[in-house]
């Protein structure tokens, strides 16, 4: 179809939207809305930007020999030239970028490149990850350049310090998240996020907060990075739904979530306030002792420390005991959007830093929506503008 969309994504500061179509790819500016680049280059399944620079990463759909889904192209849109091409053993399922690292996700591998020279610096063996569940912090500072991905399933290979694979013999770790330092190229912690497999991960702009959702999609949790302390627990809904997108605003006090339902939820995070009781500072890094009452916690510490090495013993001990994390009810949304898209339509969402803030929703149906968010009252957001990303529909469909 000439008027269909394969892929949509925001750039790292939510100022642009990249679009992949059966004909090629397009870049749109969010405010003011408008197309700023397009190229007919065959079907594109992944189009990721590096902030507002002319550097983009594209992966084809395989409709043409030069657009193999195993081939990643780094393109300079200003010069309209290909900087380099990288070919992988299997299809590329996801791409993440910041100013220091390019991360490429395959079915069971993650490749990390130095973006300044496109040299491979690290490879991580993972469990099968067909959904490319992963997040890379937009910040590439020395302290907060983190990559997060599902903790590998148990295998016969144990973790050895200095190697790039983490494995653990403990069962039921499908909902755990690995925090990986992209500067030191070492795992630094494991987050016990959910009991069921992960569906979506998101890091805030400075790499200090991690949002997680499982394949149930009813609960969204927010953890500190890299300490892995649970800070918030939000309820999206009562019935399971696939989570498509989670994004913090740049100030990290609002978080938007889209799913296979018609509702987009906006949650409020207040500075210094969490939905779980605080633990004294000396308790946070304490190493649990094995007593009958703390057997489960000690087991987590013992197994996790075996996986991550002795240097992480204190960090793994920062997991909050169940008696703390289970005492508070999850918080509900602060504001919401009722979408007009068909149920199940994939979408990505973000919250702007404007005053008042706006919620941006982009769908695979090919529409870009702008909603106003009332920070005082919350509640349902008002649609102010709607645009089409399709070539056969031009201009604003709603609003001025």
Swiss-Prot record:
Keywords: Autophagy, Endosome, Membrane, Protein transport, Repeat, Transport, Vacuole, WD repeat. InterPro entries: PROPPIN (IPR048720), WD40/YVTN_repeat-like_dom_sf (IPR015943), WD40_repeat_dom_sf (IPR036322), WD40_rpt (IPR001680). It is found in: Preautophagosomal structure membrane; Vacuole membrane; Endosome membrane. GO terms for molecular function: phosphatidylinositol-3,5-bisphosphate binding; phosphatidylinositol-3-phosphate binding; protein-macromolecule adaptor activity. It holds the Pfam family PROPPIN. SMART domains: WD40. WD repeats lie at residues 193-233, 238-277. It is a peripheral membrane protein. It comes from the Eukaryota. A motif (L/FRRG motif) lies at residues 234-238. Belongs to the WD repeat PROPPIN family. The PI(3,5)P2 regulatory complex regulates both the synthesis and turnover of phosphatidylinositol 3,5-bisphosphate (PtdIns(3,5)P2). Necessary for proper vacuole morphology. Plays an important role in osmotically-induced vacuole fragmentation. Required for cytoplasm to vacuole transport (Cvt) vesicle formation, pexophagy and starvation-induced autophagy. Involved in correct ATG9 trafficking to the pre-autophagosomal structure. Might also be involved in premeiotic DNA replication. The N-terminus might form a beta-propeller domain involved in specific binding to phosphatidylinositol 3,5-bisphosphate (PIP2), leading to the association of the protein to the membrane. This is Autophagy-related protein 18. It comes from Yarrowia lipolytica (strain CLIB 122 / E 150).
């Amino acid at each position: 179809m000439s008027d269909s969309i394969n892929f949509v994504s925001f750039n790292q500061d939510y100022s642009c939207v990249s679009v992949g179509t059966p004909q090629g790819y397009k870049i749109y500016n969010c405010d003011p809305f408008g197309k700023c680049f397009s190229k007919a280059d065959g079907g594109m399944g992944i189009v990721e930007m590096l902030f507002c620079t002319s550097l983009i990463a594209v992966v084809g759909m395989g409709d043409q020999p030069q657009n193999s889904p195993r081939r990643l192209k780094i393109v300079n849109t200003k010069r309209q030239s290909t900087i380099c091409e990288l070919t992988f053993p299997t299809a590329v399922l996801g791409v993440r970028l910041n100013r220091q690292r390019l991360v490429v996700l395959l079915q069971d591998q993650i490749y990390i490149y130095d973006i300044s020279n496109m040299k491979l610096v690290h490879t991580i063996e993972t469990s099968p990850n067909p959904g490319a569940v992963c997040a890379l912090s937009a910040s590439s500072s020395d302290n907060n350049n983190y990559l997060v991905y599902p903790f590998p399933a148990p295998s016969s290979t144990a973790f050895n310090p200095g190697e790039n694979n983490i494995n653990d013999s403990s069962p039921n770790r499908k909902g755990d998240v690995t925090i990986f330092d992209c500067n030191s190229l070492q795992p630094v912690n494991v987050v016990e996020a959910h009991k069921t497999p992960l569906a979506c991960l998101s890091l805030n702009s400075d790499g200090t907060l991690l949002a997680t959702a499982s394949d149930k999609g009813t609960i969204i949790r927010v953890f500190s990075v890299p300490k892995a302390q649970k800070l918030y627990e939000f309820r999206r809904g009562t019935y399971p739904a696939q989570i498509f997108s989670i994004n913090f605003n740049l100030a990290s006090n609002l978080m938007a979530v889209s799913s296979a339902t018609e509702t987009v939820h906006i949650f409020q995070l207040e500075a210094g306030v969490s939905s779980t009781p605080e633990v004294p500072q000396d308790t946070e890094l304490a190493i649990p002792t094995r007593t009958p009452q703390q057997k489960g916690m000690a087991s987590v510490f013992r197994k996790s420390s075996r996986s991550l090495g002795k240097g992480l013993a204190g960090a793994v001990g920062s997991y909050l005991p169940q008696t703390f994390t289970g005492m508070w009810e999850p918080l509900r949304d602060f504001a919401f959007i009722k979408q007009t898209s068909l149920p199940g339509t994939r979408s990505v969402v973000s919250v702007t830093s404007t005053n008042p803030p706006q919620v941006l929703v982009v769908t695979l149906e090919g529409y870009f929506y702008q909603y106003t968010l009332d920070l005082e009252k919350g509640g349902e957001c008002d649609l102010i503008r709607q645009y089409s990303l399709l070539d056969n529909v031009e201009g604003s469909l709603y609003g001025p």
